[in-house]
Amino acid sequence: MTRSLGDLARGRGDDADDFDDFDDFEEEISTKPKARATTRRSTRASTEDVYEEDGTDSPPRTSSWGRAGTFMDEHADGIALTLVGIAIVLGAAVWLGVGGPVGTFIADIVHLTIGAGAWVLPVALIAAAVALMLNYTPDPQSRTRVGIGGSIILLCMLGLIHLFAGNPAEWAGRKNAGGAIGAWVGTPLELGFSVYLAVPILFLILFYGALKTTGITIREFGGFVTGFFGFGAGAEDDDEEGDDLYGHVDREIETRASGRALPAAEPRPTRVTPRRTTSSTPRRAAASLDRYPADEPGTPPGPPPSVAPTGSRERKQTEASTSIEPALFPEPERRKPSVSETDEFPAVKAPETPAAEAPAPAKDSARDAVAASRENLRQAMIQRSGMDPQGPPKEEPEDNPGVVVSDGDSTYVLPSADLLIPGAPAKTHSETNDRIIEAITDVFREFNVDAAVTGFSRGPTVTRYEIELGPGVKVSKITNLQSNIAYAVATENVRLLTPIPGKSAVGIEVPNADREMVRLGDVLNAPATVDNLDPMLVGLGKDIEGDFVSYSVQKMPHLLVAGSTGSGKSAFVNSLLVSLLTRATPEEVRLILVDPKMVELTPYEGIPHLITPIITQPKKAAAALQWLVEEMEQRYMDMKQTRVRHIKDFNRKIKSGEIETPLGSKREYRAYPYIICVVDELADLMMTAPKEIEESIVRITQKARAAGIHLVLATQRPSVDVVTGLIKTNVPSRLAFATSSLTDSRVILDQGGAEKLIGMGDALFIPQGAGKPQRIQGAFVTDEEIQAVVEAAKVQAEPDYTDGVTEDKGGDSKKIDADIGDDLDDLLEAVELVVTSQIGSTSMLQRKLRIGFAKAGRLMDLMETRGVVGPSEGSKAREVLVKPEELDTILWMLKGADPADAPKEEQWGDDGYAEPVGEGPGDGSDDSSSSDGTTVVRANPAGGVF
């Protein structure tokens, strides 16, 4: 609807459609030149409007295209669903080859008709169905034009495919080319001309079909190309105001709001803008705003504008302005006015007339209509922007300087890093550095090595001296002098780095005589650490160049820490835990602490981040690791059901409300916190239950990264029986403190270097994906600092322990078959190997498990009796009857446990309701019902609450 602002100001309430017209005007003002989606009523509405305004009795003529459009409008959904069904059948038959006899027959017909076009036909049908579902029905003229242009494009494309395929004469070749249609188009052109002329001719016709489909000319296409590549950017900016259909209304509103007089009316160039009617009510002729004076007290309203009779000429213009299809190249999008910009235009209040000067009844009705119109406008602005233009401005919220994390009803204040003691300023140079430079230079001079010290980087523990070699000098000459350099600088802990990463120089690392202590407070208060909002970022220390080093546990994602007694391993564990307490809330990160020594992690007892009290017994530690495995499996099942790949995406969807409980399910989804399990001494656990501990660690480190579960394994005895090959393979990040031998260094780092460290926090750190270790000085935190941070966390919340974490779930109902005997561990390994590789070979078991032929044959017989593999087929490998996704269930059964206790996932039943996999109706084992009837299902059978 097009109605002038003067009509609104005069309150023209002569019929019931005035306020509907006002709503349309308000919508058009707010959405200015944006193209709107056309409804199925638009074409018929514009035709009916013209018919009513014309006043004639003859109904509008309807063409065959119009009748077809009416039929499509009435049956759009049915046609769309039919197209979707055809597309599914074609896609299954053409793409996947699973269409069955009927689908294959249909696919053959389509291939014979359009050849390679059958591959894209399902996509085209889906696009047409979506267009029908979105109510996109062009006017009859556009249908004719698009139909002709699309047919031309289709014929040309099939002809080109036929020619590019070499003009096959056999139908088998035409099925993969352009089909019968492509041969019908391409073969005559090639016979009449040649392939070198037929291809350009088809491209020209194809270009004409594109112009026909889009409805533009070549000149308009050239203008679009120049504008697209930036040649017409200036002209487009200059004409921005002219493109705005309602720009003059905005200027008049600003003029009236400021109280200035309106300027003289200027002729406005006519511009036909492709717009569609959004209302079926008849449109009135627009009256210029300049014909009405400003609203001032005592000013009588002017006469209403006269509406010229609508003749055939104006009817045609109305049809042209309301029924033109949307523009092919839309105008540049303009941003909507913000709330602050909207508030700059105060609403014009109706003037108050004293009782002595009561206007005539006509004036009263007009002012009532004006007041109603303005009130509607104000309500619309409140609804759109959320602010009242006539109301008082909202107060700005005050900034809260504290670090407060709010989650629902609980508000947790992170302990401040200011509780930690800051360190002394770092030194950059000392007399010792000059003396060592002279000593290294003398060694090079004595052995006639063309090399020189070009610089050094002083760290808190060691200083790295950069050696630049002369032309033709081998690096091996420097490495062969390692013992002589150590003798010259009077220390045995000299480490050579060949070369320094990122530099063309050899590094010689010499310990500092005056070591510096790195405080954890300095690391956590470093700008790079403060700017990083990752709650799992931990402070490691300071590198050899004097920069603070921090790293996220999520990126590790599992860490192996090793070092001899007094090397700084326990200090690092304390730094890690204090870092987590100062950066993460209990809702974000939960902890499982395993302390076989019973004294290292005692200060952290009672913090709200704990899932279970600090574990000191190895048997309970093994049960806790098994609980982590079950928790990991349950999380993966939930992520599978919600179709996410990482716990971050799952929590984001939970908080935004995108994940809803399936119909009929009693499960209540909650956001999962990250879980970090810290084992202070792995050697004690491996001595007690090595098989169970290793199996749980391997499963967690292999799969738990995306589930938000991370392991930090520390040991002071990095031998091969503690840090096994499977554990090393699946723990990518390593932190090595000083070790007692080169063998231990190779176990933890797969290379030497840790035996050269000087202890007391000196470490080599290899994060995931790094090629060479980075030497750092670990951060130190005192017992008083630990106590202060722990108390700040404990006073805010009590620990919410989870039941069943440390319960031994293996000795209750396990009944191992008698024929298995003591071979259960070997049988489990054999089953996992066979099911994973899908090869049932006895010789493979011999090689992989390093067992004899007799035992391998016995294991194969045991697997045959339990349905894992089929019977023997002579020299051929046996058939594997268990799929890889069924491995966990078969292992669970072989251990003698009840299969019903295995982790379950929910799937959709036949009746449309969610049912747990493997449970019958009415089987609800661990459900707990609340007073309001809501049943919360625990996340895993061990009793986890996440």
Swiss-Prot record:
Domain notes: Consists of an N-terminal domain, which is sufficient for the localization to the septal ring and is required for cell division, followed by a linker domain, and a C-terminal domain, which forms the translocation motor involved in chromosome segregation. The C-terminal domain can be further subdivided into alpha, beta and gamma subdomains. The alpha and beta subdomains form the DNA pump, and the gamma subdomain is a regulatory subdomain.
Segments of skewed composition (Basic residues): 33-43
One GO CC term on file: plasma membrane
Transmembrane residue ranges: 78-98, 114-134, 146-166, 191-211
Biased composition (Low complexity): 263-288, 347-363, 927-936
Cytoplasmic side: 212-946
Residues annotated as binding ATP: G566, S567, G568, K569, S570, A571
Keyword Protein transport: no
UniProt main location, coarse: membrane
Region (Disordered): 1-68, 256-409, 898-946
Biased composition (Acidic residues): 15-28
UniProt protein name: DNA translocase FtsK
Subunit structure: Homohexamer. Forms a ring that surrounds DNA.
CDD domains the record matches: TrwB_TraG_TraD_VirD4 (cd01127)
Native source organism of the sequence: Corynebacterium efficiens (strain DSM 44549 / YS-314 / AJ 12310 / JCM 11189 / NBRC 100395)
GO molecular function: ATP binding; DNA binding
Domain of life: Bacteria
The protein's role, per its UniProt record: Essential cell division protein that coordinates cell division and chromosome segregation. The N-terminus is involved in assembly of the cell-division machinery. The C-terminus functions as a DNA motor that moves dsDNA in an ATP-dependent manner towards the dif recombination site, which is located within the replication terminus region. Required for activation of the Xer recombinase, allowing activation of chromosome unlinking by recombination.
Ranges of residues in domain FtsK: 533-746
GO biological process, one term: chromosome segregation
Biased composition (Pro residues): 298-307
InterPro entries, sorted: FtsK/SpoIIIE/SftA, FtsK_4TM, FtsK_alpha, FtsK_dom, Ftsk_gamma, P-loop_NTPase, WH-like_DNA-bd_sf, WH_DNA-bd_sf
Encoding gene, per UniProt annotation: ftsK
Protein family according to the UniProt entry: Belongs to the FtsK/SpoIIIE/SftA family.
Subcellular location as annotated: Cell membrane
